[in-house]
Swiss-Prot record:
Skewed-composition ranges (Basic and acidic residues): 320-331
Family: Belongs to the ATG13 family. Plant subfamily.
Effect of gene knockout: No visible phenotype under normal growth conditions. The double mutant plants atg13a-1 and atg13b-2, or atg13a-2 and atg13b-2 are hypersensitive to nitrogen or carbon starvation and show early senescence.
Residue(s) carrying Phosphoserine: S248
GO biological process, any: autophagosome assembly
The protein's name in its UniProt record: Autophagy-related protein 13a
Protein role: Involved in autophagy in a nutritional condition dependent manner. The ATG1-ATG13 protein kinase complex regulates downstream events required for autophagosome enclosure and/or vacuolar delivery. Becomes a target of autophagy under nutrient starvation. Connects autophagy to plant nutritional status.
Gene Ontology, cellular component aspect: Atg1/ULK1 kinase complex; autophagosome; cytoplasmic vesicle
Compositionally biased tracts (Polar residues): 301-315, 371-386, 419-437
Modification after translation (UniProt): Phosphorylated during nutrient starvation. Dephosphorylated in nutrient-rich conditions.
Low complexity bias locations: 453-473
Keywords: Autophagy, Cytoplasmic vesicle, Phosphoprotein, Protein transport, Transport
Amino acid sequence: MDFPENLPSDIGRLEQIVSHFFPKALHIVLNSRIPSLQSRGRTRERLSGLNVRKSDKWFNLVMGDRPAALEKLHSWHRNILDSMIIDIILVHPISNDNLDDDDDHSDSVVRSAETVIERWVVQYENPLIMSPQSSDSATRYQKVYKKSIILLRSLYAQTRLLPAYRVSRQLSSSLASSGYDLIYKVSSFSDIFSGPVTETMKEFRFAPVEVPPGRLCASVTYRSDLSDFNLGAHITLPPRIITDYVGSPATDPMRFFPSPGRSVEGHSFTGRAGRPPLTGSSAERPHSWTSGFHRPPAQFATPNQSFSPAQSHQLSPGLHDFHWSRTDAFGDNHQLSPPFSPSGSPSTPRYISGGNSPRINVRPGTAPVTIPSSATLNRYVSSNFSEPGRNPLPPFSPKSTRRSPSSQDSLPGIALYRSSRSGESPSGLMNQYPTQKLSKDSKYDSGRFSGVLSSSDSPRFAFSRSPSRLSSQDDLDDPDCSCPFDFDDVDESGLQYSHSLDRRKTSSSISQSLPLGRRSSQDAAVGVLVHMLKTAPPLRQDSSTYMASMSGVQREGSVSGTESEFSMARSTSDALEELRNYKQLKDLLLSKSKSGSGPTRVH
């Protein structure tokens, strides 16, 4: 705020701040307490800063044009040393029990009483002893002005926290005359509260602002409890609870909620690039927050109304159009609709065209859902992973495939993912066409497409992780790591990929699918070597050690089923057969040695 430069001294500027502080504080209190004054100054022009007087811009708090009553009150205050006392008075009716028996008033006449529920005091305290002036008098008024802004903002906030503010709001929104009203009285002096009234009042003092040679003070004395006046029983307020809201158990399920103008239909997303959006006959159902929730269910979608692969690629999973009662170029009216739904009930299905897509028969009132098969989803996989907006599916997640029953089945998926990232298809051809079907077994898709369909049978796209680095949550899924080094893979495209080895049978498969000389770092190669040395069987073992090791393997459960027991029985019988042959050979050698070492003849 720029102050006038024609003031004679710094004292004149300080007096100007105080003189503007009093009417601003009065305007704040009356605007929050008197219902007849609350409607004034609430126009759009006040919010936009248009048609605002220069005096209203003081203290960076625009309250709007002052009413005529405030203009009259502004003229009475000429001396800043006089206190300004604002009494907020509640006018309330009194019962006939309080009337005297000899009163001439009839029962039809209602008497009212006035009770002071708040008293605001704003004053400038000028000490009798003048304090010495500091040397920085040139910037003193700027500090006082900034502190005055803080004091007025505190005053503005405190007016909204006291009980009288709630009464003022109730009276301003009352539907009928209740006999209650709030009035005010402004004066330089007031009567002192009596003893019983003082016990029901509380006082709050604001931090004063030092304005040399005195200080600017503000305080409020208020009634903390207004339940004695029984305001709730006499004030008729508009209902705040909607009893016939959409989805209420008390509402008829087939009730039609009309909307003004044309019919409104809810969509999760609309068409783009000249494609018309789905009409009312398509496979969709209005959401619960639209006006047509209880309409009869529409017919299911036909194959010619489903999205094509090209349309699926052009629609990004995370981008949806939000419309608020807006009519598009095709004449359809749409409302605001979030892209994701918390449950499967209000979600609009998303279709991928294909003749072999299985459908689920649903009862009326449930959104139709199409679950795409793995072969259909593989057909529309795009190799351009650098553009996530064109890829309708999340990127490959090698770690998520480890949740499958076999840990080795996920390794070809990792190799396929890396080959697709480098632009090579498994068959040696360039994977440039999105309609090319990847030659990959369907069991590899169990981890990759785990986030596409939710448990509520509502197709949606989950937020995919970064393909270059797995999240820390996946690292916690595998606490057992037998390799002491991090397995960091750096492919030709410069992407880093971290992967931890399994305890059993994983190092050999990784060494086959990922050559160490090309993709593995030196630390990873040492880790694989240490793992191989730890898990390598001994070079020589006897039959007892072999039997003990086979029994230990059987206890661990690595061999299961009839086939494994049959192979173990064959190995035991073969060992016994070899032992029997060794015994026969030993007996034969001993018999020959005895026959050869008989008594020799002496010639």
